[in-house]
Design a protein with these regions (language model features):
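ATP-dependent adenylation/nucleotidyltransferase module used to activate substrates
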Residues: 1-153
Length: 153
């Protein structure tokens, strides 16, 4: 078994092991946080391959590229699209500042509130940042599975 096949098998096994918890938390099973990017697309397909119960949700930011929205609607029509209560422009007016690297308030309002009370699947990679690398595959406090492809071999 090659490295990629091993990572896929590991991820599928982890999804299957945690499915009981996901179903206890929600009758829909996992809440898959979907962005249309390569990581969430890969995680979507891993969940399909695992045969686990999940529902994919995308939090629309109002600044998503039209090409991305067309891609999601055409290739992933089962993804539930959620519009924010307040759009990014109103949020900037309310905060009286643009989001910057040290003050990233926008995701807390537009994306991170989704999936509360569920086991949420996040397609993130350790290589993206030291903070993401420090995350565990399963975070019980938030009931989040990171979809890690970085397990020991």
């Amino acid at each position: 078994m090659g490295a990629l096949e091993h990572k896929i098998a590991y991820s599928i096994a982890l999804l299957r092991r945690a499915e009981t918890l996901a179903l206890r938390m929600s009758p829909d099973g996992y809440h898959l946080a979907f962005s249309g990017g390569k990581d969430s697309v890969a995680l979507y397909h891993l969940a399909k391959m695992a045969g686990v119960k999940f529902k994919a949700h995308m939090q629309i930011t109002n600044i998503d590229p039209p090409e991305l929205m067309r891609f999601v609607r055409s290739q992933y029509p089962d993804v539930v699209l959620h519009r924010p209560e307040i759009n990014i422009y109103k949020l900037i007016e309310k905060k009286k500042m643009l989001p910057i690297r040290t003050k990233r308030y926008c995701c807390a309002y537009l994306k991170e509130q989704a999936g509360g009370g569920t086991v949420t699947l996040l397609g993130i990679r350790a290589a993206e940042s030291p903070r993401r690398a420090a995350r565990n595959e399963v975070q019980i406090g938030n009931h989040r599975f990171s979809g890690s492809f970085d397990q020991p071999q």
